Structure formats: C-alpha cells, structure tokens
Amino acid sequence: MPEISRPAYADLFGPTTGDRIRLADTDLLIEIEEDRSGGPGLAGDEAVFGGGKVIRESMGQARATRADGTPDTVITGVVIVDHWGIVKADVGMRDGRITGIGKAGNPDTMDGVHPDLVIGPETEIIAGNGRILTAGAIDAHVHLICPQIADEALGSGITTLVGGGTGPAEGSKATTVTPGPWHLARMLEAMEEYPLNFGLLGKGNTVSHDAMLSQIRGGALGLKLHEDWGSTPAVIDAALTVADRTGVQIAIHTDTLNEAGFVGDTLAAIGGRGIHAYHTEGAGGGHAPDIMSVVSEPHVLPSSTNPTRPFTVNTAEEHLDMLMVCHHLNPAVPEDLAFAESRIRPSTIGAEDILHDLGAISIISSDAQAMGRVGEVIMRTWQTAHVMKRRRGALPGDGRADNHRVRRYVAKYTINPALAQGLAREIGSVETGKLADLVLWEPAFFGVKPHLVIKGGQIAYAQMGDANASIPTPQPILPRPMFGAIGRAPASNSFNFVAPLAIEDGLPERLSLGKRFVAIESTRGVTKADMRENDARPRVRIDPDSFAVHIDGELVEATPAAELPMAQRYFLF
C-alpha cells in the first residue's frame, strides 16, 4: 500500500484527522476529529479542483445533471468548526441551503460519495482545502443607526442582524428599538438591498398589550425593554404576557439605577418565564452592580456585548465617554456623571471574562454603535478565548488542542443567538437543511478577515484584489462586495425574520418586498439548558460596596490584559 506523509498530504488536500491548526495568532489550537472527505484509510479519492487534478469530466465530475439532484456548489475538503464538532468534509449547497456534509465526487469512479454530493457539470467548486468553515455569525444586539453597519458586519463574517432603530435618532442611538408599524415597514423596505437576514425589535416598554401586538403584526420578531424607556416590573410582566401569547422573545436591558426595583424585583416580575438578558456583563448597563447574578437562573438567556471583550488595560477608560454619548448624558450634570460611573466597574468586567469561559454567559453580540463595534463580534470573541486560555489553562477535555473551548466560543455567536431568537430552524450552524450562510477563513486570518462570506449559497463578500489586475490577488486586497451583494441577489439569498402573527396578518402581501418573510419558531420554551456548550449556572455574588465578585464562593481577581492577538499585526489603522 503506497504511503504519503502528513506534510505532503496537507499540501495536496489540506490537513486531516489528528492534525492541529492554530487559529490566527492566538494560543488556540484545533484538532480535526474526523475526515469525511478522505484522510487515513480513505486517502486517494479526494475531490480537488485545478489543472491536472480530480474534478474533471468522467473523473471526479459525473455526468449527472441538476435535475438528478446535483448540488449547485461544493466546498471541497474544508475544516468545519461548529458547536457540534470539528471535522473535515466536502460541503454541498443547493437552492441556497446546505444539502450534504461528507464526501463529494463521482460515484461512477469513486467510492463512498455522498448521494447529495455528486458533482455534475452544473456544479460550481469552492476550494476549502486548508481552510476553515464556520456558520455565518448572528449579531443579536444591533442598533440600526446607520446603514453602513451592513458592510462592516458582512465584511467581518456576520450574516444576520437582530436589533432595532430608525437611524441616528436619540431613541435608536440608545435603545435598539424600531417603534411602531410605520417605522418597522420603512426599515424593512430599507433593508432590501443588503445580503443580510434581519430581525427587528419593537418597543416593549408599555403596559398596553395592543401597542405591542400592533408592532408584532407590523414586522417585529420580538420586543425590547430598555431602561431608558422604563424597564419597570409592570412593563416586564406585560411584555412577557404578550410574548407567551405570540411566541416572540423579549430582550431586556434592566434598570441600572434600581429606581423601580432591584435585580430580585426584576426576576420576580419575570416569574420564571424565558427572557434574553442583554448586558449580563460588567459595564453595559442593567441593575448596578449585580446584574450578572442572573446567570444562575434557569430561564434567563444571558448575553454580553463586545466593548468589554476581553477586559484590557484600556477598557474602563474608554467606556466613560462612550456611555455619555450613547445615553444622551451631559458630563456637566453631576447626576449624569454618577449614572455613567456606576456602570463602569473593572471588577465586574474582569468577572465577565471568567463567566464566558465557564459557559455561564451564553451569547456575545455587538451593541453596534451604542458602545459596541459591529465588525468586531467575532474577533473579540476569540480574543477573549485566548486570554482565558492563558490565564486559566485548558478546559476539561482539552489537551493537545482546544476543541472544547473553541466549540464553546463559536456557539456564542452562532447557534445560541439563533436559539434565543427562534431562528435555529433556519440558521446558526453548519448542518444539512439550513440556509447556506457560511464563512470561509484562511487559518492565519481566522476571526479577523474572512476569505469568503457566503450568503444563502452565493458569495456575497470576499477578500479581493485590484479589479483591473490580471489575476484576483494583486494589492490592495480588501473586503469587497461580490455578486451576492448587488442587484436583486440579496432579496433571493436573505430573509426577514418576523413573528408568525405577522405572516398570518398579511404583512408580506402588504409590503410586497422581494426579500422573503420567514416566521420564527416559538422562543417560549427555550431555557439556559438549551444554550449549546454555554449552559453553566454558577452562583454569582457581587458586593454592593466594593463590587468584588465571587463565583461559586471564589473571589475573582480582575486582571486586565495588556496585549492581545488579532490586533495590530493585522491592521494598519
């Protein structure tokens, strides 16, 4: 039996089972658990494209037609990194969805070809060999302040935005809300040209069930409660009552000043019902100083935002000015300044790092332009994982590689926000049947600059060189919109997520948009136990005077990082 060395195999076909890959310039390593496209025991029939290579007529390419079921596109030999595992496979896409994960090729000449991965003359090929594939990121906390965030999001690997706003109005700059059916309709119209899935949050700060139902019929996939509009116990109870009736999620930013009640009062108003707790973090807002204690609750889905990810020597200083701007505060007013300073606590920011690494905070989002950066969700997630590995060592089950930690952190911006918002039937993971929202990475640039962003099976963004060059690679190489991002393509490759009530009420017919409306699944049964790799519920106690944090009785030492990976090595500015 002829043999091939691992280095030679990796050069030809990419890494295989047992090989390890470093993620960008971090200390994080992944190890391939399984090779479904070749590797040990299966080598010799790998589907690769190029001059003198396999995918040619009557070799790796069959004569089967699209009518016979061949995929529209196959990504060859790519390393999938997802919450369910780290495997190498060929990935097929058809009609904008993932149709197969396994071995692609021509069953007439090759053994073990997956029936849904037969390569025909109508199949396009993307070379994934030596690259990493993840699900498109879901940013579940976005202020829709300016349309340019769409490009920043796509260029970073985000394919779905959930949030609210109407533009640079004070309400939108502070509170992630698109209020009322008129604004909801206008924002849905505005989003037609972007190859992103959108979900809008209506205003839940009211005791009027009629007002909330009007917004859900008008296109809101959920409701947002924000302290700047008054997150009182009565409002919380009313919003959750409507949510239980309609299946939508409630996202809450609780009462920093504890004016209408403390964290215990908020939990009492929630009453064991499911809720997505925005800003379960060290400085983003909510009950001061102990909002993070909600991570121990079984019905609370905790998330935090990226400006505090990870805790560094610059974090606290940066936050004061950001907070004053975002919440329309005046530094000349002592009460406004005291409000801002009460939210910025280094000890709780440091504890946020630990809670993420324990899997106690389940989701990371941006809080885009309202103290967070939409294009840095993915990057800051992996920076946090790197800092935690250096500080805390390997997680249980990790040894030669960090697969457990990597699965935990990738889930925070893919499957878990999808589950929290009722989107997991359609998006959030690399699984057969789901929308082909995928991100292809060069390992050296993982989490920093995507090689390709695939939206609904179509390349929407890519690292691309000079368009007047003779080949695609001459400088300047920049993230640029591709054909999936222009013309009528976004309407075909992307969704507007809305509540079932909006579909039943005829919203798609009333607006007559090109982008498809898709009903969310009910969120009302989703609990902390459903958060993949992030279902821990430690006891958290925060001293009201010193802000010292104890997790399961152990004092947390807030140690800011002075140096990070995925930073100046990759960016000029």
UniProtKB/Swiss-Prot annotation:
Residues found modified as N6-carboxylysine: K224
- Which UniProt keywords are given for this protein, alphabetically ordered? Cytoplasm, Hydrolase, Metal-binding, Nickel
Detail which positions bind substrate: H226
Catalytic residues?
Answer: H327
Q: In which pathway does it act?
A: Nitrogen metabolism; urea degradation; CO(2) and NH(3) from urea (urease route): step 1/1
Q: Which reaction does it catalyse?
A: urea + 2 H2O + H(+) = hydrogencarbonate + 2 NH4(+)
Source superkingdom: Bacteria
The cross-references to Pfam families, in alphabetical order and at most eight, read:
Amidohydro_1, Urease_alpha
Instruction: List, in alphabetical order, the GO biological process terms annotated in this UniProt record.
Output: urea catabolic process
Q: Where does Ni(2+) 2 bind?
A: K224, H253, H279
Signal peptide annotation: none
Instruction: Establish whether keyword Metal-binding is in the entry.
Output: yes
Main subcellular location: cytoplasm
Residue positions binding Ni(2+) 1: H141, H143, K224, D367
Concerning SUPFAM superfamilies, the annotation shows: Composite domain of metallo-dependent hydrolases, Metallo-dependent hydrolases
The record's CDD domains line, in alphabetical order, gives: Urease_alpha
- Localization of this protein: Cytoplasm
* Record note on modification: Carboxylation allows a single lysine to coordinate two nickel ions.
Please give the cofactor(s) recorded in the UniProt entry for this protein: Ni cation
Domain Urease span(s) in chain numbering = 136-573
Similarity annotation: Belongs to the metallo-dependent hydrolases superfamily. Urease alpha subunit family.
The name this protein goes by in its record: Urease subunit alpha 2
User: Origin organism of this chain?
Assistant: Streptomyces avermitilis (strain ATCC 31267 / DSM 46492 / JCM 5070 / NBRC 14893 / NCIMB 12804 / NRRL 8165 / MA-4680)
Q: Upper taxonomic classification of the species?
A: Bacteria, Bacillati, Actinomycetota, Actinomycetes, Kitasatosporales
